[in-house]
Regions:
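Histone-fold recognition with a strong bias for associated Lys/Arg-rich disordered tails
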Residues: 1-188
Length: 188
């Protein structure tokens, strides 16, 4: 299937892999595909997302923030406070004893074998679905090549909950889809 991907669409998937690794994610999720798209897409496609308030820097910052807060978030801190445990004090004590990075999520352990040698990070089921939907979008439009905009349509068609939140919810997604489709129509 990847032989049908344009150079930009391939670069977006490659960039998704790179971003997932940099953000210390053990998997490539839909959010990483969106981030990869925003990193390499044509200016017109990036502009469509930027007008909706979705930029590469914003998505990356939100993913980094989510990753940093993932082990124990604010709700967990409140629950622990209710039983007399100050999570901030525990964190400070651990960082004082073991260093500032003591609570950082470690870089995922590389797999062994052939996949490890090529630096493979697996796609989540949702991210795989987005890749497959990009092919379906291409076929439905009778286009020959899967481009970044097809990948964007697939993200908009099947966002996971995190991606939907980043994109601004269902209404924002509904407004983005025709704008991305219009880009493809102009290119055809």
């Amino acid at each position: 299937m990847f032989e049908r991907f344009s150079a930009v669409a391939k670069a977006a998937v490659t960039q998704a892999h790179k971003q997932a690794r940099e953000l210390r994610s053990p998997v490539i999720d839909v959010e990483h595909v969106l981030l990869g798209l925003l990193a390499v897409a044509e200016p017109a496609l990036r502009e469509v997302f930027a007008e909706a308030g979705v930029t590469q820097d914003d998505v990356r910052a939100r993913l980094a923030e989510r990753g940093a807060a993932a082990p124990l978030g604010e709700h967990d801190a409140e629950a622990l406070r209710s039983i007399g445990i100050d999570l901030d004090a525990v964190r400070a004590s651990l960082e004082a004893s073991f260093g500032e990075d003591a609570l950082e999520r470690s870089v995922p352990e590389p797999r062994r074998g052939l996949l490890a040698r090529i630096g493979h990070t697996p796609l989540t089921r949702e991210a795989k679905k987005v890749i497959e939907l990009s092919l379906r979008e291409t076929l439905a439009r009778k286009d020959r090549v899967i481009d970044a905009a097809h990948l964007a349509l697939a993200v908009l068609c099947a966002p996971n909950s995190g991606t939907a939140e980043i994109l601004g919810g269902d209404e924002a997604i509904a407004r983005l889809r025709p704008r991305v489709t219009a880009l493809l129509d102009r290119a055809a």
